[in-house]
Amino acid sequence: MAGIESKQRRAQKKAAKAAMKEKKNKESNESSTSVEALNEKEMINTIKSPIIETADTADQENESEGSDEVELSDLEGIELEEDADLIRKRKLAINNTVALENIYERIKYPDDISFVENQAVTTKEPIIIENVEDDLARELAFYKQGVSSVKAAFAKLREANVLISRPHDYFAEMLKSDDHMEKVRQELIKEATAKKLSQQAKKQRELKKFGKQVQLAKQEERQREKKETLEKINLLKRKHTGGDLTTEDDFDIALSSASADTFKKGSRSTKSRPQPNPKRQKKNEKYGFGGPKHRSKSNDLDSLAATEFGRKGLKNIKSKKRPGKARREKARK
């Protein structure tokens, strides 16, 4: 029973504090309406005082909530006063237009000052937004207001003969010195050069890798051709020697003729020799060969073959046979 009574007392204290809070809020609202009759300094003080009071009440409320926290499980089975659980926190909002207008009149520019000095533009129509919670619509309204204000300001500045655009030949001194910008330029050039060199090195590595692949493929192709050529030669040898050839060893006649033409005597050497210039040949036939003449009267292979001492002439000359022993003895006597 003692626990239930303590819980009831706590709940009653909480309800009493909430009632005191509502009473203070009503008093602050009544005090804000009476600000119109006060002077300017009193108005400012009245603006500050409710804020301080609300801060104090908020601190007191936080302290009271911290000290008198009651769990929901403890309040079960207790009959509270009517509307005790409907107490909610409410922020105090003050919109004292009279004080704000008085302050504005005090700090605003005088009417006789020129537009060039203050450059203050006030829109003719207020901003009207259907849904103030829509961020896009709100920002669009601010943008339109700014554009219209800038256009109005440009018109007033043109009337006052004030230049509002930069000339085409305007030379603006840079914030950084020339030495600093030269260092920046050198650094940018260095970075660009390093990037270019890295790209070139990467490209060379790729080409080298591709070149190795091509070289290996070429070597494999040469080995395969060499193997095929040796097989063809062996088959041709067996064919010419009269060896037994099976159907598996046969190959096309065109292939054998091609291999025979390939291995003709002197066929490779004639192709590899450089051919004489036809223009040079014509001149040699017309004017003769302009080379050395000191051996022009010496015999060569063709001239020697034309005589009896040539290879053909010597073949016709038969050597005398050696006489027999009886003839040799007879000749000695």
UniProtKB/Swiss-Prot annotation:
Annotated GO biological process: ribosomal large subunit biogenesis; rRNA processing
Domain of life: Eukaryota
Residues in coiled coil: 212-240
Pfam families, per the entry: Ebp2
GO cellular component: nuclear periphery; nucleolus; nucleus; preribosome; preribosome, large subunit precursor
Ranges of compositional bias, category Acidic residues: 56-75
Keywords recorded for this protein, A-Z: Coiled coil, Nucleus, Phosphoprotein, Ribosome biogenesis
Family named by the database record: Belongs to the EBP2 family.
Subunit structure: Interacts with sad1.
Function: Required for the processing of the 27S pre-rRNA.
Listed name of the protein: Probable rRNA-processing protein ebp2
Organism whose genome encodes this protein: Schizosaccharomyces pombe (strain 972 / ATCC 24843)
Gene: ebp2
